[in-house]
Amino acid sequence: MAAAPPLRDRLSFLHRLPILLKGTSDDDVPCPGYLFEEIAKISHESPGSSQCLLEYLLSRLHSSSGHGKLKVLKILLYLCSHGSSFFLLILKRNSAFIQEAAAFAGPPDPLHGNSLYQKVRAAAQDLGSTLFSDTVLPLAPSQPLGTPPATGMGSQARPHSTLQGFGYSKEHGRTAVRHQPGQAGGGWDELDSGPSSQNSSQNSDLSRVSDSGSHSGSDSHSGASREPGDLAERVEVVALSDCQQELSLVRTVTRGPRAFLSREEAQHFIKACGLLNCEAVLQLLTCHLRGTSECTQLRALCAIASLGSSDLLPQEHILLRTRPWLQELSMGSPGPVTNKATKILRHFEASCGQLSPARGTSAEPGPTAALPGPSDLLTDAVPLPGSQVFLQPLSSTPVSSRSPAPSSGMPSSPVPTPPPDASPIPAPGDPSEAEARLAESRRWRPERIPGGTDSPKRGPSSCAWSRDSLFAGMELVACPRLVGAGAAAGESCPDAPRAPQTSSQRTAAKEPPGSEPSAFAFLNA
């Protein structure tokens, strides 16, 4: 800066310090409009006051938070058109602080994300373009303190103006008519057109600022919420020479002593990508997958995998941009790079629900790969030699009788034996033979009859109960009276073999042959 301001100007500046403290506070309360005019008056007092004012504003711009930086930048932008010429001169000499604010970044806010950083960067770029523009700024001469500038709708600060107010503003020189391709009625911008045509030039300036802000830093939440197809169609060609921060980040990630990224390196990489252009970082990483060393390729693959595990970019978009390079690496000679590329490619395809051409054209199963039959679950299980067989196939042996041993006076029914050609364990891998033996074993399987013994399956005419009953096969507990009566009946017939009879059997013997046996016959005894 220039020489130190005199002591008198410093003391005069101290009286205006509360105004500056209120206008540049570190909170989200916007600066009141009247403070802009009060601060502009300070710059018109004297060159020393302008120098003190600039020193204070630049110190606040350097040390304050995001809200304070944004307020200081708005005050400086207002002073570009309402401040003194000496203030603008010394502000141009200290433009390094404005360039530092143009690269302002930090960790995203949990609620607002990176919106505050983008506003600060856009305001700094707007201030720099206004301060160093080719057009001459409309600087008014230093006004005395006693005559403040006239403010209000339609008011003009002209000494000889007779009529003031809305509708009496003097028209300035002619304005060149420009051709607007998107306008209706021939596409010519007229002087008396509506607000849509008047705001076209302002929208173009705002679009330039927003585009530059999007190139310098992208919001992680907005990048993750885009549709993958829309990203593939609307992706802009990013000039790698304009992405110096992204290029330095990729160089730092791909150059390391180890072949894989540590957890700290991956976290630092994801945090840095949240403040930069993630699409440019992905494009630079894919450039390091070809023509580089094996260690560089592995670190680039790890960085791509870390980027895919975050929510900065959709996995469909990452797969669309990296699939050709990953497929080329996965088809190379076996090695760590090939394995890593194949693993990442399969992970992205599984996450996106897509299949690679190599996996999609699989060979059709031959006739030997037919679906196994229902008996193959156990017939195909062959025990190891020397091991105990716990589970045998269904068709190995017929179902044996599970009834308890009959008493001494109870004659047992003969159980048929299977034919002698039935082998205990069929040959594995022969489903037709297993099915045939399973059907044969079902034909010779004994079934339980209501009498309590097992007998071979007979036709419906030889069965005691031709119709299935709800309580068929259930043995009821006999009452003590019925048991005593049964014992007396047994003593009267000593020659008959004694066998335990249930109440259902006795009831069935008393009832006529045509009636259905009842499960509650003991209630009527």
From Swiss-Prot:
Q: Where in the cell is it found?
A: Golgi apparatus, trans-Golgi network membrane; Cytoplasmic vesicle; Cytoplasm, Cytosol
CDD domains with a match to the protein in the record: ENTH_like_Tepsin (cd03572)
Q: Compositional bias of type Low complexity: which residue ranges?
A: 193-225, 393-412
Q: What is the effect of changing A519D?
A: Loss of interaction with AP4E1 in vitro
Is Membrane included in the keywords of this UniProt record? yes
Basic and acidic residues compositional bias: what residue ranges? Answer: 434-448
**Which residues does the UniProt record annotate as the domain ENTH?**
8-141
What outcome is documented for mutating L523A in this protein? Answer: Loss of interaction with AP4E1 in vitro
Q: Which GO terms describe its molecular function?
A: protein-containing complex binding
Disordered: annotated segments? 139-229, 355-465, 487-525
Q: What segment(s) does the record annotate as region Interaction with AP4B1?
A: 467-477
Tell me one Pfam family matched here. Answer: ENTH
Q: Gene3D superfamilies under this entry? A: 1.25.40.90
Q: What is the effect of changing M474D?
A: Decreased interaction with AP4B1 in vitro
- Subunit structure, per the record? Interacts with AP4B1 and AP4E1; the interaction is direct and mediates the association of TEPSIN with the adapter-like complex 4 (AP-4), a heterotetramer composed of AP4B1, AP4E1, AP4M1 and AP4S1.
The record's annotation in PANTHER family points to: AP-4 COMPLEX ACCESSORY SUBUNIT TEPSIN
Q: What is this protein called?
A: AP-4 complex accessory subunit Tepsin
**Source species of the chain:** Homo sapiens
